[in-house]
């Protein structure tokens, strides 16, 4: 088998694969499935023919190996053609299967709760609910439900009560449906500031103030201000300083500083370096730090920024 024969066999395989892919990409639904399958079969037959021609010659380039590779590529092309005939947006992974696609179906995603404050996975997004509804007004698909329903945390939950869903031009009685439920969020997004230690004067152990350059309020973290600026009252007058979650960068720096404070003097010097490297939303930190004379929480002390 010469080099030119091998190249021609490989080119025939590539052309067959390309034609199969082009034929399968033209179909957008089940009606184009037969054409895609025919294209895949044609591609497989063409690849097999090329493989036979290449394998029959045999020679220094291994005709048998070339034939096996051609058969493999033909099978891949047929698989791509088969995958192309499925319609977009399968409904096999949803807890209920709609009877029709017009939206006025009996299996609307409306459920009744057994308790309140839960979260229901409701296509296309979860809804946090406040109270059970007595009547639900549904506009058009995608369904808009107000007030939102809730279910128990027993997947899958069977709803025992019935709901009336108002569709134009008549009301439709909705039977109980199967729904998937999820657990509530693992963390609370609105934390209690008193428990977290935000803004409690100098007792806030690095959460909001940064003990590296203890400064006025946030000057150790580069929030600027020698007792002035939008950070408000500092730790000396016992007021509430700016919370550490004011911005993402500030929160990250505050948590990093809190970790560094656990390691003694080396941590304090490293914290001072962190404070000197970054600039806050109110400009760079001034070099004239006002050192704290008040007590520092947990036996710490106020060290100057280097």
Curated annotation (Swiss-Prot):
Region forming the signal peptide: none
One Pfam short name: Chorion_3
Region described as Disordered: spans on this chain: 86-108, 196-244, 279-306
GO biological process, one term: chorion-containing eggshell formation
Gene Ontology, cellular component aspect: egg chorion
One GO molecular-function entry: structural constituent of egg chorion
Compositionally skewed regions (Basic residues) per UniProt: 206-224
Highest taxon, organism lineage: Eukaryota
Protein name listed in UniProt: Chorion protein S38
Gene: Cp38
